[in-house]
């Protein structure tokens, strides 16, 4: 279980309130598929994933990225109980989709990079530390069903 300080919660929620879920979600998922091409096997139905430009411009990637980040936002509302908040998604990704849980860590790290690029100097070292803690906690919660 991850325990967030009041300061970490403030940093996470403060930045989250400024995040364009559609834009950041699409970019994060797109970058995951470009940087870690083996993750594309989970998205066969998305059509053309043949190049970085095809992936980043793919409307299905963008739409699913928004869906992923929307679910991520729900976890932010439940920082004190990520495991419970993400239990159904953990079950779905384990039992039905058979996603390698390592991919949750990869996507979390990509998300931090995308946030840093979008928020520049506002994304301080303290902000990064809080978000790294969050994405690690989300990855652990999503991996729970696998154990």
Swiss-Prot record:
Binding-site list for heme b: 64, 93
Sequence ranges assigned to domain Globin in this UniProt record: 3-147
**Phosphoserine modification, residue list:** 51
CC per GO annotation: hemoglobin complex
Alphabetically, the GO molecular function entries are:
heme binding; metal ion binding; oxygen binding; oxygen carrier activity
Which pairs of positions does the record mark as disulfide bonds?
Answer: none
CDD domains from the UniProt entry:
Hb-beta-like
- Listed Gene3D superfamilies: Globins (1.10.490.10)
Which tissues express it? High expression in yolk sac blood islands, fetal liver, and embryonic erythrocytes. Very low levels in adult liver and spleen.
Coiled-coil parts of chain: none
Tell me the GO BP annotations in alphabetical order: carbon dioxide transport; negative regulation of transcription by RNA polymerase II; oxygen transport
Give the keywords, sorted.
Heme, Iron, Metal-binding, Oxygen transport, Phosphoprotein, Transport
Free-text function comment from the UniProt entry: Hemoglobin epsilon chain is a beta-type chain found in early embryos.
What family does the database annotate? Belongs to the globin family.
**What protein am I looking at?**
Hemoglobin subunit epsilon-Y2
| Encoding gene per record | Hbb-y
């Amino acid at each position: 279980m991850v325990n967030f300080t009041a300061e970490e919660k403030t940093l996470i929620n403060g930045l989250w309130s400024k995040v364009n879920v559609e834009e950041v979600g699409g970019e994060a998922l797109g970058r995951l598929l470009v940087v870690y091409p083996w993750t594309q096997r989970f998205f066969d139905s998305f059509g053309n994933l043949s190049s970085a430009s095809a992936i980043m411009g793919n409307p299905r990637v963008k739409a699913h990225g928004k869906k992923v980040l929307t679910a991520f936002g729900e976890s932010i509302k439940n920082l004190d109980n990520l495991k419970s908040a993400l239990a159904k998604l953990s079950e779905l990704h384990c039992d039905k989709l058979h996603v390698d849980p390592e991919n949750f860590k990869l996507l979390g790290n990509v998300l931090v990079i995308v946030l840093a690029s979008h928020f520049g100097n506002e994304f301080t070292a303290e902000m990064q530390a809080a978000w790294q803690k969050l994405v690690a906690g989300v990855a652990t919660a999503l991996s729970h069903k696998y154990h």
